[in-house]
Amino acid sequence: MVPVIWLTVLIVLVDSLQIIPTFHDFQRAKTDLLGLIESVKRGDDLPMIAGTVRLAFHDCIGKGKCDGCIDHSKPGNAGLKRVTDRLDALYDASYKGKISRADFYALASVTALTRSTANLSDKYNGLRKFKVGRKDCSTSPVESIDSSDIPRGSDGTSKTLQFFKSEFGMKTQEAVALLGAHTLGRCSLQNSGFVGSWVDQRFSTAPPGEENLSPTSILDNAYYRMIIDIVPWTQVNINGTRIQWQEPSNSIPNDKLPESKRSPLLLNSDMAISWIIKPSDALGTVSCRPTSLKTPCRHSNAHTFAKIYAKNNALWVKDFTKAFNKMIEMNENKLRKAPIFNGYFDEMNSHDEPINESVDEISEDIF
């Protein structure tokens, strides 16, 4: 009976251990993650930027919050396996036991966001306040417990804002700031049922130059400009299963067009940060229109914040950073500041392998 008791105690102790990476391992992880993000290209787009940010959001939803676990069987998580497969391969090969998977996922997103503003005047500085020590779920990287439902893009204003309040304890302004992450990436029919990207070149803050990334890989306030500066959005039916908003000048549904001809889109949850959106069916159909004389939409309480962010990119990046950090710091463990150089101790405890030199030049500019 005694061995069984000791085994139980050992399991409890192992389960409660908090992994804090050394300075050396933390620096190597940042560099290797940047290399991975840079290695996956689609023209001038780096899809892992949007992919890791989306992963962080989905990882932080549910009972365990940011716990390094994703239930890939849930429709709302469709498409994330391409992201986790790449991250998990790197993690399992080089960082397992040195940093928690939850920390690794969160660090990937923050590294990606840092890369997304590398050529911009308004920099994302979330790495400066990054914390470590997140606890993985017991079945990491696979989610084994029932988690919260992923918010749907077809949800209206009330449900969208309530989700951020219930899940992350966020006020309306914080929710509006966090939703600005939609400036990154695009929707695909096979993953979400929607089609298109939220932004295009019109409102990009990137300076002219061949080295610039696609607008879908740049963290700026173009998303708010699309909502505030382009008022006459109209609803279209996608594949008979979803309703999304497109500009009237491009009213052909995006799923019927080649990618080069597609219009930027907004979801109900995006329109919610400016308008009171009340879907009348499961598709997300809304009876009002922003410019309609007969059935005009009324502005929501979030509209004021969307207007502010549309006019002030620097302020939005600052507020987004705070909201994003608030989200990724949710975990049952008490987190600590990321390790800084601690002289002799870290030198003696570091590993002998050199840091990935292929991205050293990029790393110096970004980190």
UniProtKB/Swiss-Prot annotation:
Coiled-coil region(s): none
Top-rank lineage group of the source organism: Eukaryota
Site residues, Transition state stabilizer: 54
Keyword Heme belongs to the record: yes
Position of the signal peptide: 1-16
GO molecular function term, any single one: L-ascorbate peroxidase activity
Function: May play a role in the protection of oocyte incorporated cells from rapid apoptotic degradation.
Family that this chain belongs to: Belongs to the peroxidase family.
Protein name in the entry: Putative ascorbate peroxidase
Annotated organism of origin: Hydra viridissima (Green hydra)
UniProt gene name: APX1
